[in-house]
Amino acid sequence: MSGKVIGKTLPLGYRGNVARTPDLIIGAFNNVGSANIPYGAPVIYDATNKGVRAVATTDSTASQLVGIAVRHIGQPKSDSPSGWYYAPGETVDVLLRGTICIETKAQTGIAARGQVYVDATDGEFTSVSTSNMAMPNTIFATGEYDANKISEVTILSRSI
């Protein structure tokens, strides 16, 4: 929910921030993939390696999507100017149910209770259904987004 002060609209939050906290479930999984998982990114459950990984271009099954990587407070990684991610082998906090702030690459068509999609080519969230995977049980909470392309989405029920 965005705040307003003297005609100014405040940001909704930051990528990966949990919002509206009373009803949420967060699970901890190892990053078993070879890629970094940015805060606020969708994650795939890897049953073979018993952990989560970032979305890859070869992914096409939405049922593999289990949640969104939660932002945590700490020092950024020194190898990247935007070093806010979980590296391979680290424990990833994953929102399994609840509301979280995400960055959307396409804001066209965002509507309250509208379906959230994931683009497998870059692992980013979008509101566009064409050639994208529907994130299971996940909707845009308010249909709003701020100047930083941040939207609130709600995962209605856990899938793992």
Predicted regions and their residues:
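Surface-exposed, low-hydrophobicity beta-strand/loop segments enriched in small/polar/acidic residues
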Residues: M1-I160
